[in-house]
Amino acid sequence: VTFHTTRWTLVRHATGRSAVGRQALSDLCAAYYEPVVAFLRREGRAEDAARELAHEFFRKLLEKPALEGAAPALGRFRSYLLGALKHFLARERERSGRQKRGGDAVSVSLDAGTDTSPGLVLADSYELPPDEFFDRQWALAVLDRAFAALAGEREAAGKTEDFARLKPWLTGDAAHGDQAATARALGISEGALKVAVHRLRRRFRELLKAEIAQTLDSPEAMAEEMRHLFAALGGS
């Protein structure tokens, strides 16, 4: 990954109404729409109400000319998005009625193809403090996107069926004793199956790092961000 051209770097260095920066921010918002909805639902909102408010939040976020005045240390889109969401909610609570949009507002919305279906939510997630809850939903979204990218690669290579059989070793759903049966189904030895699983895991990790990199502005932050997200998944 070239950190000079990650989506978050393009956003951070955009000036005014830079088309490149605005598109990069729109892409990031579309990618991480679901953690925002989950955060809003955690506060007791119904599904439809949370999604409507999420769209309003992203609309306002995308109308900003640029991240003017953003703290230099804000090198993670995750941190920026959560801070912006908290600020938005504080403003919403202060309003006694709906604020009318200005006539000079530029309307920018999420792409029509944005997946707004419910994402992964761990059963006990609502028991976490708000920030930790958001980070866990964020981590789940990162994993989901990396997994989807891997599935897309296998489909493009004509390996959809093989991937479906190997998938349990990525998700942790493979039961003891499944290895021999899977090897027979694929027509390979158990040794070859172990190699295939190892390669698949390695590729998944590469795609995971690539996905995380798009939300950072420096390679130095990668190791820390990965540790943070895995800790969020573990609840520790």
Language-model segments: residues:
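Intrinsic, short, N-terminal disordered tails of RNA polymerase sigma-factor systems
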Residues: 1-236
